[in-house]
């Protein structure tokens, strides 16, 4: 299992300089996981593309659907106390600590 940041998921669907790397990671290990937060983060990222008219609503909707299908069954709720402990013990954001929490089990 690999806990992936939302940006890594986005790289698969938004062609750019990191797309090939994300595709290689997926080929190496298809068991990707993330906290439920990833969905909101991806929607926020896609909102920017939609508002700048870089992607249509139909494309944004399809990216969200495909991304959710990719991670189905591997989305995790996180324990708030564990996340707060990680925040206390690091300089990471609360968002990043959610991903770390999933990776730590």
Name each model feature, range by range.
Residues 1-37, 49-58:
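Short, well-structured N-terminal submotif of metal-dependent ribonuclease cores
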Residues 8-10, 44-47, 99-101:
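Hydrophobic side chains within alpha-helical segments
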Residues 25-27, 68, 104:
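Short glycine-enriched loop/turn motifs at secondary-structure junctions
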Residues 34, 59, 91, 95:
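Conserved acidic
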Residues 43-72, 80-83:
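Active-site-proximal, substrate-binding regions of enzyme catalytic domains
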Residues 72-105:
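Active-site neighborhoods of divalent-metal-dependent phosphate/nucleic-acid chemistry enzymes
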């Amino acid at each position: 299992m690999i806990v992936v940041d939302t940006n890594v998921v986005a790289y698969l669907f938004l062609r750019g300089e990191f797309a090939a790397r994300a595709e290689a990671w997926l080929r190496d290990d298809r068991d990707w996981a993330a906290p439920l937060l990833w969905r909101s983060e991806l929607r926020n990222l896609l909102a920017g593309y939609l508002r700048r008219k870089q992607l249509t609503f139909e494309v944004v909707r399809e990216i969200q659907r495909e991304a959710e299908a990719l991670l189905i069954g591997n989305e995790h709720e996180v324990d708030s106390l564990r996340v707060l402990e990680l925040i206390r013990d690091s300089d990471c954001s609360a968002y990043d600590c959610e991903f770390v929490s999933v990776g730590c089990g």
